Curated annotation (Swiss-Prot):
GO terms for cellular component: mitochondrion. The keyword Ribonucleoprotein does not apply. This is Putative redox protein FMP46, mitochondrial. Belongs to the FMP46 family. Keywords: Mitochondrion, Oxidoreductase, Transit peptide. The lineage of its organism: Eukaryota, Fungi, Dikarya, Ascomycota, Saccharomycotina. It is found in: Mitochondrion. Coiled coil: none annotated. The gene is FMP46. Putative mitochondrial redox protein which could be involved in the reduction of small toxic molecules. Residues 1-21 form a transit peptide. The active site is at C93. GO terms for molecular function: oxidoreductase activity.
Amino acid sequence: MSMFKTIQFQPRVVTLFTHKLESSHAQNLLTALKSNHKNKINIEICQKFPTRDQLEYLAKIDKPDLMEQIPKTESLLKKAAEDPLFGSPLQKCVENGSWNKQTSLWVDWEKAVLGTTVQSLKEKWLPKN
C-alpha cells in the first residue's frame, strides 16, 4: 500500500482542550464526538494550554470562537513562543484568567474548524464529516 493510501485511511484527530475532563461541558463534547460513527476519529484530550504556534493557527481558523475560550487571545499572540503560559496546565490558566472555565475547546486540525459547545460541533463539524 502506498504511503498516501496509508495516510488516507488514518483516523482524523480531534483535540479537546479542557481544564477539567469531568466537567459537564467536556463530557457533553466527548459524548457528541464519540457518537459520530460516520468517520473514524481519534479524540485527543489535552489539559495544557496551546503552544504559541497552535494559538496562532487557531486564531486564523476562527478568532471569535477562540476568544470565547481564550479571552486574552490578542495579547497572548504578542508574547514570545517561549512564554511559560504556552504549554502550561489549563487549571493554572483558569486561575490567571487566560482560560474560560465555563467551556472547553474542540479542534479538528485537518478540517480547520473549532468551537466551544455541542451546538458548534453540530453546526460546524458533524454535518460535514
